[in-house]
Design a protein with these regions (language model features):
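Short secondary-structure boundary segments
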Residues: 1, 67-69, 75-76, 128-135
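Short amphipathic alpha-helices and their capping/turn segments at secondary-structure boundaries
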Residues: 79-83, 116-127
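Amphipathic coiled-coil/heptad-repeat helices and related helical stalk/stem segments
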Residues: 115-116, 165
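Residue-level signal for pocket-adjacent positions within structured domains
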Residues: 4-5, 39, 44, 58, ...
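The feature marks proteins involved in alpha-glucan
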Residues: 12-94, 99-107, 114
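Beta-strand-rich binding/interaction modules
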Residues: 1-7, 31
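Aromatic-lined carbohydrate-binding/catalytic grooves of carbohydrate-active enzymes
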Residues: 102, 110, 121-166
């Protein structure tokens, strides 16, 4: 169901930032910005700084509740305190998630939760020390491999939700 509600953003003085509070808005609700420019043209645009997006071909931003994640990296952070860059070799595996795992029949892509254990097993087996994920931010065109970013802080919805990404 599409409900068109229009609210005005308010500028935060001396910051270049605009803000808005919408009573009743909740996680899962979709939204876009309406931009009116000279000449009377109007554009509807997704939030480039949102945390989630609709799965393509839809293009709205989605309100995401990111508070329900329990970090489990204290051991890593403790080790990192004493790590000296340059004292150990680095081997980076650059990967595009869309070509790493074959999705189940009827799916365009595998889910982050399905991909994660397979990536970990592979990089450990091959001796890589780091992983660089290509095309992980939201982008409109599959063929771009993520080089046309439209959501800088939204992990692409092709592979699941922000909660799936944090798995």
């Amino acid at each position: 169901m599409v409900i068109n509600l229009f609210y005005t953003l308010f500028g935060v003085p001396d910051s270049g930032i605009f803000e808005l509070f919408i009573p009743g808005a909740e996680a899962g609700d979709c939204y876009k910005y309406e931009l009116k420019i000279k000449g009377g043209l109007t554009y509807l645009k997704a939030d480039p700084y949102g945390n989630a997006a609709q799965k393509r071909p839809e293009t709205a931003s989605v309100i995401a509740d990111l508070r329900d994640f329990s970090w489990d990296d204290s051991e890593f952070l403790k080790k990192r305190e004493s790590y000296q860059c340059g004292n150990a070799p680095v081997s980076v595996y650059e990967m595009y998630l869309g070509s790493f795992v074959t999705p189940d029949e009827g799916q365009d892509y595998a889910n982050y939760r399905e991909i994660a254990p397979k990536v970990i097993d592979y990089v450990k087996k091959m001796g890589y020390t780091h992983v660089e994920l290509m095309g992980i931010a939201e982008h409109p065109f599959d063929g771009s491999w993520g080089y046309q970013v439209t959501g800088y802080y939204a992990p692409t919805s092709r592979y699941g939700t922000p909660q799936d990404f944090k798995y």
